[in-house]
């Protein structure tokens, strides 16, 4: 396996100075470096990959056991080895079973919970479940991490399909987040969803208590307007939420992969069970493709291999996700968690130090906004930032097709500009046309040179529908899985989030003066003193 990595790096070193544009002299470049699956068109021809590099990457995937590991995941094997758990978020969108964990078919339970969620969502939507002030007008979803990022992203993405109550998402323990969500809504017609797998997450439970106190000022029985998305029926009950309004999920569903089940209840209420089922169907379609397609034609595998070429082989430590679809403005933040929490590891599955770079820093903003913010660095900065563009061929505003045409033109132009660049000769010609000469021409031309040869991929889809969004999210989930397998890490734990939480719990009594902070470092204690000096804690 080390030999393949060495071959890849040697291949890159030998080819690194060539121009991507020259690769298109081979007539079938676009066909060879693109793939189409169920309405998704993935173009990775604007990269420095060639047949030899792609062949080596595919061999690496085979040698590292992507196919066998994929089969193990779908079979319910406990591939989350550090926690001893199966990884079966895919079961939440599966149409039927059997799917077994520890010899037990989990699908009857999955389908029963899905039906319960759909029934409750429809009751809220049609008014048969009411608040104490009448029909539900607003839903406040309280969660953090996977209990917020996925639902909030998808709810915004599918705004054209909203025909239910208004949705509000609260995640941050910062009181400003809760205060902003509750402004202007009526507690007598508000439903609160508390999303916490353990029902102990400190930020979520703090916000839940605040929401209940807020509601208690105007409502006789606040608990009657609360719903729990949790595996802990007991803790939800202690909070006042009965079992019939508690929707649970099993430990084989990781938080950042949980949107497909009860954690998606808010989205179900917003768009309705039928549209949510289409969302599940899109993801299930991608699951089947990932399971069945040969590696060379497998969209999640190709997405992963391109990413690994850029990160592990070319050494680019960051990846920009650039959706030219304003309703996908939360997708980069969602993918930050999905990719960085999954593959931001330094230890291999066997406990040894990782031999390759782990996952990249993922970030981004929607186009065209980003063009007027950070694209300057992407085009002319000293660091190469591989870019992933996403764009729909068709928008949701038929009266504004000229807007969408301009949006698409900008997206395609950016990918072309990153690859093509502008030479010094071209820049000189531009300055000469403006009447500049001599040293001033040279000086001004230098500022207008674009190095080009900067890689990007484009994911084109017909229109952002529930089905398409399901496909896209599942595509990225499986991409993360493939990258994790090749790196030899566990993509399904997140021990890196624990230490900070433990230290925060210990610091709170220091802030209130109940603990003197013995053993804390001088910097932390000085910051505590500075906060206490201002007051307000």
From Swiss-Prot:
One of its GO terms (biological process) is glucose 6-phosphate metabolic process. Keywords: Cytoplasm, Gluconeogenesis, Glycolysis, Isomerase. GO terms for molecular function: carbohydrate derivative binding; glucose-6-phosphate isomerase activity; monosaccharide binding. PANTHER family: GLUCOSE-6-PHOSPHATE ISOMERASE. It catalyses: alpha-D-glucose 6-phosphate = beta-D-fructose 6-phosphate. Catalyzes the reversible isomerization of glucose-6-phosphate to fructose-6-phosphate. This is Glucose-6-phosphate isomerase. Pathway: Carbohydrate biosynthesis; gluconeogenesis; Carbohydrate degradation; glycolysis; D-glyceraldehyde 3-phosphate and glycerone phosphate from D-glucose: step 2/4. Its EC number is 5.3.1.9. Belongs to the GPI family. Pfam families: PGI (PF00342). It comes from the Bacteria. The keyword Isomerase applies. It is found in: Cytoplasm. InterPro entries: G6P_Isomerase, G6P_Isomerase_C, Phosphoglucose_isomerase_CS, SIS_dom_sf, SIS_PGI_1, SIS_PGI_2. The keyword Cytoplasm applies.
């Amino acid at each position: 396996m080390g030999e393949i990595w060495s071959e890849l790096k040697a291949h890159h070193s030998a080819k690194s100075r060539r121009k991507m544009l020259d690769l298109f002299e081979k007539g079938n470049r676009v066909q060879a470096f693109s793939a189409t699956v169920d309405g998704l068109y993935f173009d990775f021809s604007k990269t420095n990959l060639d047949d030899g590099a792609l062949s080596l990457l595919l061999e690496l995937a085979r040698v590292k056991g992507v196919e066998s590991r994929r089969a193990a995941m779908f079979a319910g094997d406990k591939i989350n080895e550090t926690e001893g758990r199966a990884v079966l978020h895919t079961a939440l969108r599966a149409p039927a079973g059997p799917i077994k964990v520890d010899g037990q078919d989990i699908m009857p339970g999955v389908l029963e919970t899905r039906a319960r969620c759909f029934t409750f969502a429809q009751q809220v939507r049609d008014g048969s479940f009411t608040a104490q002030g009448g029909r539900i007008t607003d839903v406040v979803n309280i969660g953090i991490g996977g209990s917020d990022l996925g639902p909030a992203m998808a709810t915004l993405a599918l705004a054209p399909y909203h025909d239910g109550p208004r949705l509000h998402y609260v995640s941050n323990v910062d009181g400003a987040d809760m205060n902003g969500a509750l402004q202007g809504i009526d507690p007598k017609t508000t439903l609160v969803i508390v999303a916490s797998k353990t029902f102990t997450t400190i930020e979520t439970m703090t916000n839940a208590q605040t929401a209940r106190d807020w509601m208690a000022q105007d409502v006789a029985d606040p608990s009657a307007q609360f719903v729990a998305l949790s595996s802990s029926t007991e803790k939800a009950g202690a909070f006042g939420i009965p079992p019939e309004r508690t929707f649970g999920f099993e430990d084989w569903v990781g938080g950042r992969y949980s949107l497909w089940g009860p954690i998606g209840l808010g989205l179900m209420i917003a768009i309705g069970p039928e549209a949510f089922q289409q969302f599940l169907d899109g993801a299930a379609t991608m699951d089947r493709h990932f399971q069945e397609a040969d590696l060379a034609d497998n969209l999640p595998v190709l997405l992963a291999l391109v990413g690994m070429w850029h990160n592990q082989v070319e050494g680019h430590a960051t990846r920009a996700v650039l959706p030219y679809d304003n309703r996908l403005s939360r997708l980069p933040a969602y993918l930050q968690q999905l990719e960085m929490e999954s593959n931001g590891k330094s230890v291999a599955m066997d406990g040894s130090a990782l031999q390759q770079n782990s996952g990249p820093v993922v970030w981004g903003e929607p186009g065209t906004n980003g063009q007027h913010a950070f694209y300057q660095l992407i085009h002319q900065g000293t660091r190469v930032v591989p870019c992933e563009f996403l764009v729909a061929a068709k928008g949701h505003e038929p009266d504004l097709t000229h807007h969408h045409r301009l949006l698409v033109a900008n997206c395609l132009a950016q990918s072309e500009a990153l690859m093509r660049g502008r030479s010094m000769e071209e820049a000189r010609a531009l300055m000469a046309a403006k009447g500049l000469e001599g040293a001033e021409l040279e000086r001004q031309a230098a500022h207008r040179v674009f190095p080009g040869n900067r890689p990007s991929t484009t994911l084109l889809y017909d229109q952002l529908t529930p089905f398409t969004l399901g496909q896209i999210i599942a595509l990225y989930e499986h991409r993360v899985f493939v990258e994790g397998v090749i790196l030899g890490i566990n993509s399904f734990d997140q021990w890196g989030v624990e230490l900070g939480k433990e230290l925060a719990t210990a610091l709170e009594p220091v802030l209130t003066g109940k603990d003197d902070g013995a053993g804390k470092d001088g910097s932390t204690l000085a910051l505590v003193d500075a906060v206490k000096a201002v007051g307000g804690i």
